[in-house]
C-alpha cells in the first residue's frame, strides 16, 4: 500500500496518467521536424506499395493514410496472409465478409521492400 501510494502520487487526474508519459507525448506532438519526416516516409512507403500492388495486377483502394486495402481478386485474403507470414511479412487477413481484401500498413521502408519482394512469390504460390 505504501509503495502504491508513492507511485500514484506521480499520476495526473482520475485516469492515473503518468507525468513522464504525458511530457513525452507533448514533446512528440510538438516535434514538427519529426512529424514532417514521418509524413514524408509514409508517403514514400505508400507510393512504393501502390506501384508494387499495381505491377502485380492487384487493385488498391485510394488512400491518404498509412495503410491501404488491396483487392486480391479471386484470391483468399487469409491464404495470402499465411503465405506472406512465411515470408516474414505481416498483413491483415480476412476481415468480416471481405474475403478477398488484404490490409497492409506502410511501416518502415525496409519492411515495405520486404512486402514488395514477397508479393509476386506469394501471388504465384496461391494462384
Give residue ranges: language-model regions.
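PLP-dependent aminotransferase class I/II
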Residues: 1-53, 58-61
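A generic structural signal for alpha-helix starts
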Residues: 2, 33, 75-76, 110
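Short, solvent-exposed alpha-helical surface patches in well-structured domains
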Residues: 5-6, 79, 114
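Conserved PLP-binding catalytic core of the aspartate aminotransferase-like
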Residues: 42-47, 51-87, 106
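Conserved alpha/beta core of the MobA/IspD/sugar-nucleotide pyrophosphorylase nucleotidyltransferase superfamily
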Residues: 63-65, 70, 95-98, 111
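PLP-dependent enzyme catalytic core of the Aspartate aminotransferase-like
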Residues: 82-87, 96-127
Amino acid at each position: 500500500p505504501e509503495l502504491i501510494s508513492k507511485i500514484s502520487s506521480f499520476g495526473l487526474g482520475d485516469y492515473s496518467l503518468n507525468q513522464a508519459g504525458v511530457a513525452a507525448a507533448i514533446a512528440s506532438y510538438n516535434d514538427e521536424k519529426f512529424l514532417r519526416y514521418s509524413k514524408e516516409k509514409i508517403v514514400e512507403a505508400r507510393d512504393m506499395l501502390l506501384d508494387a500492388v499495381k505491377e502485380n495486377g492487384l487493385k488498391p483502394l485510394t488512400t491518404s493514410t498509412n495503410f491501404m486495402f488491396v483487392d486480391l481478386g479471386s484470391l483468399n485474403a487469409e491464404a495470402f496472409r499465411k503465405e506472406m507470414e512465411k515470408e516474414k511479412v505481416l498483413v491483415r487477413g480476412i476481415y468480416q465478409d471481405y474475403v478477398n481484401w488484404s490490409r497492409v500498413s506502410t511501416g518502415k521502408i525496409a519492411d515495405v521492400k520486404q512486402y514488395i519482394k514477397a508479393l509476386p512469390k506469394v501471388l504465384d504460390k496461391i494462384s
